[in-house]
Amino acid sequence: MYLESKRAPAVRACGLTRRFGRAVALDGLDFSVAAGQVVGLLGRNGAGKSTLLRIVSGQLRQTGGEAELMGAPVGMETLGRLCLIGDTPDFGGLRNAGEFLAVCRCLFPSWQEEQAGRLMTLFGLPLKKPLKGYSRGMQTALLLCAGLASGAELTIFDEPSLGLDAVMRERFYDEVVAAHRREPERTFLISTHLIDEVARTLDYAVMIDGGRLLAQGSPEEMTRLYLCVSGSAEEVGAATAGLAVLREEEVAGTLVRYTRLNAPEDAERIRACGRVQTAPVSLQRLFVLLTEGKEAERDAG
């Protein structure tokens, strides 16, 4: 659970821009993430997530704007407080997991040896088996174990579910929640396009699309002003009069309308009508609705 503090933001971007020739990967991105949370960086493949992570980890320089970690510009001082687990396993010629963990022990000042051992057992990873004999899922799990046990003030996982089966993915998310409960001062940032899968884990979410900020806030804050309303066209129209419509479709003769509320109280008013059915809008569905809206705006422009 997120505990408010006066610490500097874990990650802050101000007008952050990155161009590759004529291609714009980040387009004036602005957001701020408070420290001590489990944060989701959510977006489609190609949205700019990996470019952003390369900038905040010092692997890539921005074209314009500012990027800060823990209140300071990205640099050697901030990178010493960061652990970035990328989406492509690369063990640099190390022979086995034991050698890899020995390197991690030297890299991270707050390395948690006991946790590392427990996680290796939990994910069924043998220390002495050659890494070339590890499956892709095992290699990914080894990296995730290192991130969890790093003790780093800011720990970032880029597409952590790649190669993992459903059981191992759920196990990983459970371990992130447990680690944050033990160490509430740490910030965990999970970059992914699998929004429904990670939603239950998050205290805060940053949605980006086309290199721009789409929305940010806690999952509850972001979804509470959206509602799915279904029924006859006449009843749905009456119940949602005066509200913005993001999308509507007809399913088996029933009109399904996704709407943006003017205030949370609108949901109770609609439910009180008794003539329509309502359902909350998931974080995944909200992302789809917002990206569709942005695409419609671009097409209209």
Residue ranges and their predicted role:
Residues 86-143:
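ABC-family P-loop ATPase nucleotide-binding domains
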Residues 64-78:
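Conserved ABC transporter NBD signature motif
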Residues 173, 177-261:
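ABC transporter nucleotide-binding domain
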Residues 155-159, 164:
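Catalytic Walker B motif of ABC-type/P-loop ATPase nucleotide-binding domains
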Residues 39-44:
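The feature captures the beta-strand-to-loop junction immediately N-terminal to the Walker
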Residues 11, 26-28:
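Conserved structural motif at the start of ABC-family nucleotide-binding domains
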Residues 57:
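Helix-to-loop junction immediately C-terminal to a conserved catalytic motif
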Residues 2-4, 244-247, 251-301:
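C-terminal coupling/interaction segments
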